[in-house]
Amino acid sequence: GLEFLLFGSGPVNSTGVEAGAFLNPINPKDLSYIQAFFIPSMYMYADTIGVIKEDYGMSITTVMTKPKSRGFVKLRSANYKDPPEIHLNLLSHEEDMKMMIAGQRFFLEVLKTKPLSNKIEKIIFPDLDNLEDRNLEEHCRKSVKTNYHPSGTTKMGADNDKMAVLDSRMRVRGIENLRVCDLSAMPNINSGNTSAPAMMLGLRCADLILGS
């Protein structure tokens, strides 16, 4: 912060994500299932790839935009004070794993391609000489984590959908005068950032309330 105030430079001078990309590394003509972030810092946890000594660098993160893996939340006990058990089951679906492996391999190949490779001193990755599926899968499972844009926890749906908390007018079933109009109401997440859909849901809910 002080470097930016004094000289107008330093990490605070960055937006945090300098560039991004949407792609489908398995079928480029199909919908994009990977969103990539290009971050101007060494963005990696010490327990996944080791302590990074380099001061300057760039990180690329690959994010699944439409994951098929499903986790669950269940009660830990009959005591309401006990926190629930949360099982994310990240990358448990075979197609998610295939897409993540393809995304990792795609960007590693990009970084090794000229003329970009001429500007790169070092690529930090467990084993650059062995990009077989098994090794990439191991890396993905060690470094996978959740990202932004949680949604769909109180989704809209048809009357016969037992998992649908809300009706089509965003009203909570079984409770009068209560609606949910944030991203929780989305039945499915969109393939990308959720700011615009969140605003749209709020606007639509306001129209529904005023109309009723």
Task: Label every PLM stretch briefly.
Residues 2-197, 205-212:
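FAD-dependent oxidoreductase catalytic-site/capping-region signature
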